[in-house]
């Protein structure tokens, strides 16, 4: 029988569940939502898009029917969707959950979303499309180390806190310094009061043994292929979107697109998609280790009990 934590009194503002891809976050969030009358809210930057349900591992129709879900698949692929837009949507979803008496359970692997929720997000002026194209056009001829060196010349403050292989964030910092003449780090210091008070939230990072996670990633990619991932990518490619659109960078999508164009075999595309996903998981773990060091950790097997144990003191 489900129990409403919010009806019992001073429950947590929200539950925040982070972890690398394929770590079992979604299943954990659904189990918790069933136990505590919650709603599962997406905190993954690829699962916001409606076009790649299978390839981005969004909840299935059956899973979504088990408990309320929000912030999944609500964005068209031909859309620029920023952290700021997600935060605005998340704020509205929080208000709706509270009105309905549901415990908000944010789950995902995008660390920047969790940071925006609990630390605030600076109101950085939008980057003009001309600047974006200029920066990304220049970047096409540079490897990650050279691109990072370019950022270090223009914005050493941001370069010092970004890894060279975090190419998207390096590009973002270059766009901001080029468009505004001000470091992204300086803009971020002006962040307003956050939507959530971290001390009043129950937070958890899932930790999975590296070898086990590798096996789970590879097996899940194979399962995605069996469930129609290639057909999803074929339909997306038929839309002929601007190559800079974020959804086209979903893990596995570039390799499968090249396969459809006759540039590589299906086996090679699958292997590349698996390898790309494993590299992404490592980057996620690095972010969690450095940027979310004060969050409690738990294995997938112990996570539900750990969360329930942390929630009880809030509900007294």
Swiss-Prot record:
Keyword Phosphoprotein found: no
PANTHER family reported in the protein's UniProt record: TRNA DIMETHYLALLYLTRANSFERASE
Source organism per UniProt: Xanthobacter autotrophicus (strain ATCC BAA-1158 / Py2)
Family: Belongs to the IPP transferase family.
Subunit organization: Monomer.
Top-level lineage group: Bacteria
Pfam assignment, any one: IPPT
Example of a GO MF term: tRNA dimethylallyltransferase activity
Residues annotated to bind substrate: 21-26
Catalytic reactions on record: adenosine(37) in tRNA + dimethylallyl diphosphate = N(6)-dimethylallyladenosine(37) in tRNA + diphosphate
Positions of the UniProt region annotated as Interaction with substrate tRNA: 44-47, 168-172
Residues of the site described as Interaction with substrate tRNA: 110, 132
Alphabetized NCBIfam families for the sequence: miaA (TIGR00174)
Function: Catalyzes the transfer of a dimethylallyl group onto the adenine at position 37 in tRNAs that read codons beginning with uridine, leading to the formation of N6-(dimethylallyl)adenosine (i(6)A).
Keywords per UniProt: ATP-binding, Magnesium, Nucleotide-binding, Transferase, tRNA processing
Residues given in the record as ATP binding sites: 19-26
Disulfide bridge map: none
UniProt name for this protein: tRNA dimethylallyltransferase
Cofactor names: Mg(2+)
E.C. numbers: 2.5.1.75
